[in-house]
Amino acid sequence: MATPLIRYLFLLCFTVCASIAMAQDGFGEETRIPEPVNPGLNYLLSLAEPVHSQNFDTGVIEEVIKFVLSSKDKTALYFPGNRTDIPSAYHEFDIHNGLKHVLDIGFNPNIPPFILSPSSIRLAYWKEINGKKQLLPDLSSMLSRLDQPITVTGVEHEEITPDLNTGAYYGYDLNRTLILLKYQGRPALISISKQKNISDIGKKGVVLGKDDNWDYFYSGQNGLNKPGLGWVNSYMYDSYTVSIFIERGGPGTLVHCGVFKWLRAGWADINMVQNQHIYRGLQRYTDTVKGILEYPSLPEPDKMAEIFSMIKTFSADELKEKVRNYITLLSQKYGDDASSGGKLITESIKDSTYLSQLSQYQMQSVLAVEYIKYLMGKNTIQDVAYFISPANINRHPKG
């Protein structure tokens, strides 16, 4: 058996090689975000703490908003320098739709919050809102009454999809704050999150085929899904995110989004994350969010919500049966492809305890993602027929 030192050197070599590969993969020069932006970022991050002032001060974040809206070197990798002990990155993008559409789909009390980012988030759900077990308020309906900023705080549980580099996936709780406001007459949403504690131990996952297929497998087994690294007990130690969505141009025509992300993760309290890793993850997130929010044929949000509500009515036994069908379809599609983790899927299908280890939320999320894949043209009516009848599909057609 390898000694701890040999294991550490092996893991360090793997991380360095991965970083070199990323450096050769089109990432530009790393550029620190201007110092005047830091006080505003620190202020926003403080709002994700369990105890903070409820009086939001727009003036403190002026420099943050200016930076988000400013023109930038498109070849540079920007990163905030306000926390020197943790890697970070910044990424921005445009959504060719209004903020109301963003809220209707991504921050809807009746639509799962991970639906905007199925390539990054396996599942997410609010454990509490404003100190109570309750639904997220209907933020979209509040856009017409933004005389004062509206603040929502709570605790959200999140589990991510397998990492593109290691195959690991993690679950953790977040303190999250949402602020809906008008900034210089423009409607804006600020989402702030801070990881509460160290994550669950990292588990082996698989990205099946191309990442934009949104096909992932979650083994439930501890470790990294990399040759020689299955023994690694990895964790996400810290993560913070500030996302700013602000309308630009004519009302309802375009939303500009800037995302600041900090992340520390690794093994034995040794951080293995670099700025490039975070930036690549933000690009992954961006591609999916834009693709969904700009897709021309989505049903109306209330029609989508009806299908998600139906999924919640399935009993535990019904969910297990439907997820069993899903895994069988995955096995048929990828089981012979060793590079896509077909062996891991086949082993799990033979394990009679596999379905029992899945939580209700995890099984519901499988069906929810399959539905959004159908809406986006990534699978067919036949692919979702095991949990949505043709009659239901016909009652909720694409737009």
Where in this protein do the model-derived segments appear?
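N-terminal secretory signal peptides that target proteins for export/translocation
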Residues: 1-6
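Bacterial N-terminal signal peptides
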Residues: 8-18
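Sec/Tat signal peptide C-region and signal peptidase I cleavage site
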Residues: 19-23
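Terminal "cap-and-tail" regions of soluble proteins that handle hydrophobic small molecules
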Residues: 24-399
